[in-house]
């Protein structure tokens, strides 16, 4: 955000979750240094989104818990009341929650440009954002390709540890 307020769509991008998200990019660069395009770029964005939620939860333990919707909204404080992304229900932000499912940005034969978000790095991060939500909170359902799932949530401490250990081995 450029600070001009809601008339431009964003207030300054200075919320806790956005700041943690940006620091998450630094962690990703220092650990696995994924190429910022296509599927690796979407994983990079997902790591950063997950750090945003994890740190926001850590900073506000008395105000929120793992099921609080605000923890799973990214940038709701800077996007004039609506989140930039929804980690709990990515489709509500126009992002996919299933690889190759509804809202998936096709990456095969995609040439990364600024105009296509480097082949959908922000859009396709929704798949792994949903994964992180599920391993943290748990949930069940049927995804876009017909696979049934039932996940027992681990909570933020264990989910965050899995997240970081994954970054270390990629």
How should these model regions be labeled?
Residues 23:
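Active-site neighborhood of glycoside hydrolase catalytic domains
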Residues 1-20, 28-170:
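Zinc-dependent metallohydrolase catalytic domains
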């Amino acid at each position: 955000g450029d600070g001009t307020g809601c008339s431009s769509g964003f207030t300054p991008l200075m919320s806790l979750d956005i700041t943690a998200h940006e620091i998450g990019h630094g962690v990703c660069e220092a650990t696995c240094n994924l190429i910022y395009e296509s599927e690796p770029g979407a994983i990079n964005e997902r790591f950063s989104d997950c750090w945003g939620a994890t740190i926001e939860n850590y900073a506000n333990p008395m105000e929120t818990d793992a099921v609080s919707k605000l923890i799973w909204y990214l940038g709701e404080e800077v996007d004039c009341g609506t989140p930039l992304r929804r980690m709990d229900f990515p489709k509500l932000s126009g992002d996919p929650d299933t690889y190759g499912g509804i809202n998936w940005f096709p990456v095969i034969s995609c040439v990364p440009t600024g105009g296509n978000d480097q082949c959908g790095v922000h859009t396709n991060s929704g798949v792994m954002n949903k994964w992180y939500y599920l391993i943290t909170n748990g949930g069940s359902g049927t995804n876009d390709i017909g696979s049934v799932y039932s996940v027992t949530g681990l909570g933020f401490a264990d989910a965050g540890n899995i997240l970081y250990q994954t970054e270390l081995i990629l």
